[in-house]
Amino acid sequence: MHWQARLTKYWAYLSMGLVTAIILFLFGYVFYRGADTISWEFLTQAPSGAVLGEEGGIWPAIVGSICFTATAIVLGSIPAIATALYMVFYCKNRRIKGLIRMVVQCISGIPSIVLGLFAYSFLVRDLAWGRCILSSSVALAIMILPFIEVRAEKTFHELPPQMVQSSYALGCSRWYTVWNIILPACKGELVSGIILGGCYAMGATAPMIFTGAVAYASVPKSLMEPAMALPMHLYLLLAQGTTSMDTAYGTAFVMMALILLSNLLATIYARRSQKKWKVS
């Protein structure tokens, strides 16, 4: 083996080992600091105590984070996938493609705190939605839209062209081909990208602080109510100082575990969908 190829191989192994070690150390350290706090009561009770969050649990924050994330996924994934379909299978004008791609790139570069400020000024105040899950979810949806669109567009480009051409050759319309051939074939990768985008939204603090997350709230019953969120709760615990540090580490571990579990489920689902499609 040439020395350059050998060096590249060793560098790849070293990088993989370093990244794995950092992730394991991060999870291990956070779990070690918060292990005494994590319990069934911590996961299922509401926060309490003279200093809010010092006692009790984080159940409303868990439910709130899931509500924020799920709503953002619905609002962000539909236009993202529609844009990707248009870019790959409908749009033939290079200038329009370049314009759309530039807009998507510009959106991806907007800081999350700016999106939060926009949602606060336009949705919370001008449209009088108030601080609620829907206001935050719109900001989060805008934030994750470029991520999902780019991943979906890449997935559509990797689809074997003969699959689409065969459908057209049989006289199938473009809409029929998209709905019955393309989307089922790419379902696994699309769902995986959507879930990963949701994980990105779950950890975003700035948009939630401005628009819908509050220090304390019960489990929300509608999208027009404010809610607790794990990033916001963690921020408040850290701001309170050393008395709440154990609870803060417990909250951080739960949030990291939810994100890791979502990533694993997305990966497993994508692989199983690919196998089923190849078999069929």
PLM regions and their residue ranges:
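Transmembrane alpha-helical segments of polytopic membrane transport and secretion proteins
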Residues: M1-L18, A266-S280
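Interhelical loop and adjacent transmembrane-helix boundary motif
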Residues: A50, M208-M256
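Glycine/proline-centered hinge or cleavage motifs at structural transition points of membrane proteins
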Residues: P111, L170-G171, P184
